[in-house]
């Protein structure tokens, strides 16, 4: 299966929708958008092709379902009936678009040197990112949206599974409600886990649908964490960052874990992008 075959397969599976398709050969993406208002989504075909080797038709079914729901929710509709409980935060990479396809700025805030917080209206099986044009219909200010979203993310269940590898404890939050990564904003939850940690606590949001927390008790733990974050990052439908964050008393610090058997786990010169982002972030705070 290559990107051209996947493009054709998806177009065939989505032929029941009133949409148009735009294929970008260079970026290997397929944009699917409504014919009535030009709203749509862009999917990365190369990522889907990579998953197809393991998941076969299951990954195609997942993408078709996701597109079906997203396109349906993009129909023009009133926002006046939206309740405060439907306002949620979502985590995105700092490279994520700052404006809609129509050029309207999204409502977002810087979070770390690697992540940003966007805000969304929860629509049940999908959500819509909030942009400036929606504020009047929602009858909310940007500050109210921030406060509501943080309140709502704290109400989410924080169930997790754990795994022990070579004496290190790993926690996985993977409820698939669209807000797993958003739980990194729940400081009370992170502090609860921190109180249980015997070693250094690391946190990672490799993609939208997972939050990984690690209690690193020996050097092997850093290597395992680096492997986990990269693996999840490459497999996520909405990737965020392959870097981990050190967590201590409510503060998140992006770190770079060096290769196996390297004694140092932090090196401010190892990647210029991280350092540049950190300087910019600290300057703007």
Swiss-Prot record:
Belongs to the UPF0354 family. It holds the Pfam family DUF1444. This is UPF0354 protein SAOUHSC_01859.
